[in-house]
Each structure stands twice: as structure tokens, then as C-alpha cells.
């Protein structure tokens, strides 16, 4: 499965990607098999997609969220509800993810809105080691962090514009079931497609 694990929709204040546009572009104009919708502090984009009836059975959409933690951003994959409040503590984020059965990814840890030094000890299942919106040095530091913590590294486009979807992606050795995908990520069965990024 080739998946972009970090994509925003118009339900993130800093993105204008509409739901119809997102699905049409992602499933027809990229080589992706799926995406994770990771809107800021909301799963409304995923909800609207499901309610709309717009569907492509051959294209997987993973319900996810990008939590705006006071010290940085955290991705949680495979969730069906939003947290009851914003600005959660570390313990609340972990509890929320566990209750949902979600996978915690430390997003762009060394970018301006990443966890930075806190990332060294923040509980997570994987680390985003390639993000085109981060500098090469920030991505290198994230990769070293994943290696030192013995955590899988993943890529995410962090797309806020339609043409950025799939700029980087992940080949995940799994079926098209979300549970299999999150399990494979935890087990490190991920190969990054870096496009023009290293």
C-alpha cells in the first residue's frame, strides 16, 4: 500500500483542499493507494467525506488528526472521535490515542512547530522523518531521533495544497485494512518514497 500519512483538508484553517477535490486528485492524479486525513484538531474532513457519499472503494482514507499540543504537533492515525478539549497534556494525548486504538506519530519533530527536545522522550509509535515542509537538516535530525529511539520512520507530505499530496509517501507492507496498516507501521514495515527529497 502506497500511502501519504499527513494530508490536510479545508477543515484545517490553513488549507483550502475540498473533500471532492481531495478524493478525485488523490485517487486519479497520484500513484497513491490511500491517504490519512490529518486536519488540525478535527476529524470533520473525514466525517464530511464519509457522509457525502463520495466514494472510491479502491482508495483508502484513514481517519486521523493532527493534535496541536502546546509544545508541538502530534499525528494520531485510526481514530473516529475528536478529543474533548484542545491543549491536552501528554498523559491525556496518550490516553486518548489508546482509547481510540490510535497510532501516535511525532510529526516534524524539529520544525518550528515540532516537539524539538521533548520528542526525545515523548511516547510515540513512529516519527515523521521526512516532511517536505521541514528543512533537510530538520528531516535528518528526525531520522537520527527515530534511529536512536528505535522507532519506525514515516513520511508525510503535510499537504495543505492539492498539488502537494503524495510528494512523499510510504510503501507499507499491509493489506488495505487500517488495522493492518497501523500494525505494519509499528513493526517498521515501511519504505519511504522520497520523491525529490532526501
Residue ranges and their predicted role:
Residues 97-106:
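Short beta-strand/loop segments at the ligand-binding rim of alpha/beta enzyme cores
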Residues 81-97:
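Structured beta-strand-rich core segments of catalytic domains in phosphoester-bond hydrolases
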Residues 35-36:
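A short beta-strand/loop micro-motif in the catalytic core of glycosyltransferases
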Residues 1-28, 32, 44-48, 52, ...:
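Charged catalytic cores and adjacent phosphate/nucleic-acid-binding surfaces used
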Amino acid at each position: 500500500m502506497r500511502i501519504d500519512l499527513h494530508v490536510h483538508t479545508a477543515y484545517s484553517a490553513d488549507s483550502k483542499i475540498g473533500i471532492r477535490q481531495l478524493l478525485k486528485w488523490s485517487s486519479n492524479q497520484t500513484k497513491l493507494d490511500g491517504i490519512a486525513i490529518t486536519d488540525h484538531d478535527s476529524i470533520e474532513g473525514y466525517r464530511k467525506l464519509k457522509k457525502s457519499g463520495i466514494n472510491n472503494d479502491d482508495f483508502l482514507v484513514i481517519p486521523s488528526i493532527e493534535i496541536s499540543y502546546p509544545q508541538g504537533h502530534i499525528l494520531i492515525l485510526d481514530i473516529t472521535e475528536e478529543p474533548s478539549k484542545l491543549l491536552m497534556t501528554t498523559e491525556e494525548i496518550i490516553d486518548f490515542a489508546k482509547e481510540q486504538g490510535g497510532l501516535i506519530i511525532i510529526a516534524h519533530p524539529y520544525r518550528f512547530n515540532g516537539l524539538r527536545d521533548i520528542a526525545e522522550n515523548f511516547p510515540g509509535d513512529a516519527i515523521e522523518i521526512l516532511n517536505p515542509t521541514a528543512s533537510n537538516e530538520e528531516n535528518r535530525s528526525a531520522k537520527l531521533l527515530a534511529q536512536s529511539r528505535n522507532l519506525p520512520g514515516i513520511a508525510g507530505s503535510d499537504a495543505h495544497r492539492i498539488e502537494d499530496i503524495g510528494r512523499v509517501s510510504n510503501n507499507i507492507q499491509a493489506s488495505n485494512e487500517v488495522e493492518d496498516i497501523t500494525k505494519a507501521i509499528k513493526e517498521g514495515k515501511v519504505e519511504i518514497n522520497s520523491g525529490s527529497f532526501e
